[in-house]
Amino acid sequence: MTAEHDTDTPEPRLNSTEIRILGCLIEKQATNPETYPLTLNALVLACNQKTSREPVMNLSQGQVGQSLRVLEGQGFTRLVMGSRADRWEHRVDKALELVPAQVILTGLLFLRGPQTVNELLTRSGRMHDFEDAEQVVHQLERLIARGLALLVPRQAGQREDRYTHALGDPADIEVIIAARGSPVERGAGSGVSVERIEELEARIALLEERLAKLEPL
């Protein structure tokens, strides 16, 4: 089978903890390859980051560990035995037969929910080299064609359509979409551009990653 194989088999549904775990593993593989795969401790820290996460979560080691085992059974994660500590890696690319660009977009949708094309282009900057928004749209359309993503039409007060992943519980997805239907977009009328906010969030995320490396793993 190729990475672009189309299938009518329904993909497994993931809960919010499993989605967060996979999103973090995808992100850290791309942004911190020197510390990837992740120890359980490092993964918990990544899951509970205060930036680049929507919503912010407060997961315990027990919750993350249990979910990792479930994901392992579904072929989404793999335990890598080590001399000092066991580590975990994702296998989203193999489980869902995705090319690298699709893995990155899926990871971003896992971490931050419905997003515009421009948000995805900006936020993927440290993880994948998309040439322009058209490349992002092309890969999103391929994910939609396979039932792995959804187009969310712009709602009242919003200027752009959004995209979200389609691997969670349908009811949860509807709640997230409804919550994002606020009449005022982030940054609108605040005097601070969305691009500036994204830049600051990226800096904070980088600092949190450096701090995580100093934590005992």
From Swiss-Prot:
Pfam families: DUF480
Domain of life: Bacteria
Family of the protein in this entry: Belongs to the UPF0502 family.
UniProt xrefs under PANTHER family: UPF0502 PROTEIN YCEH
The name this protein goes by in its record: UPF0502 protein PFLU_2135
Originating species: Pseudomonas fluorescens (strain SBW25)
